[in-house]
């Protein structure tokens, strides 16, 4: 029994380490609400070049984010999406909402580089999106629900 248990411990430690690293990468800055962090990462009413837009986001985490989507509409329009009927999110929670129709967005995918010299390939789309929404926290705009996570591009 002991050799088998000793053999699985390093694997468990590796998995725990990878999970902690993933949580730290996704963690929002301490001085922002989840909705403020969503806005920083995803709301970009006027399209910008991915490399420069991503450099702002990457400064918060001090790493190159692998993939990011920018919604080219004001925060108020994304917040209105939170008023559409609830649907299931990818994680099975029921706090997701789909945009009314196709929206202009840009997806940026990391192609090369190490922080702070991250390089991205951008792809422009016109497609619906799904966001997770929660009640606002102190410091958030006064909508009944605010977007906190971009769950999926449809």
From Swiss-Prot:
Compartments, as annotated in UniProt: Secreted
Main location: secreted
PROSITE patterns given in the database record: RNASE_PANCREATIC
GO molecular function: nucleic acid binding; ribonuclease A activity; RNA nuclease activity
Keywords (A to Z) from UniProt: Disulfide bond, Endonuclease, Hydrolase, Nuclease, Secreted, Signal
Gene Ontology cellular-component annotations: extracellular space
UniProt-listed Gene3D superfamilies: Ribonuclease A-like domain
GO annotation (BP), single: defense response to Gram-negative bacterium
InterPro entries: RNaseA (IPR001427), RNaseA-like_dom_sf (IPR036816), RNaseA_AS (IPR023411), RNaseA_domain (IPR023412)
EC numbers for this chain: 3.1.27.-
Binding site for substrate: 65-69, 90
Active-site residues from the entry: 42 (proton acceptor), 149 (proton donor)
Expression tissues: Expressed prominently in the placenta and is not detected in any other tissues examined.
Cysteines engaged in disulfide bonds, as pairs: 50-93, 64-118, 82-133, 89-96
Stretch forming the signal peptide: 1-27
Family: Belongs to the pancreatic ribonuclease family.
Function: Has a low ribonuclease activity.
Name of the molecule in the record: Ribonuclease 8
Organism, as annotated: Homo sapiens (Human)
Lineage: Eukaryota, Metazoa, Chordata, Craniata, Vertebrata
Primary gene name: RNASE8
């Amino acid at each position: 029994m002991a050799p088998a248990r000793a053999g699985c411990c390093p694997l468990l430690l590796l998995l725990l380490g990878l999970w902690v690293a993933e949580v730290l990468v996704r963690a929002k800055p301490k001085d922002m609400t989840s909705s403020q962090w969503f806005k920083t990462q995803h709301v970009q009413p006027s399209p910008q070049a991915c490399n420069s837009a991503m450099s702002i986001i990457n400064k918060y985490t001090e790493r190159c984010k692998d993939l990011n989507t920018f919604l080219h509409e004001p925060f108020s329009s994304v917040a209105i999406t939170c008023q559409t009927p609830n649907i299931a999110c990818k994680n099975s929670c029921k706090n997701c909402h789909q945009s009314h129709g196709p929206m202009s967005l840009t997806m940026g995918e990391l192609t090369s580089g190490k922080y702070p010299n991250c390089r991205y390939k951008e792809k422009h789309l016109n497609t619906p999106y799904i966001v997770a929404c929660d009640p606002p926290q102190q410091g958030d705009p006064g909508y009944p629900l605010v977007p906190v996570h971009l769950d999926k591009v449809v």
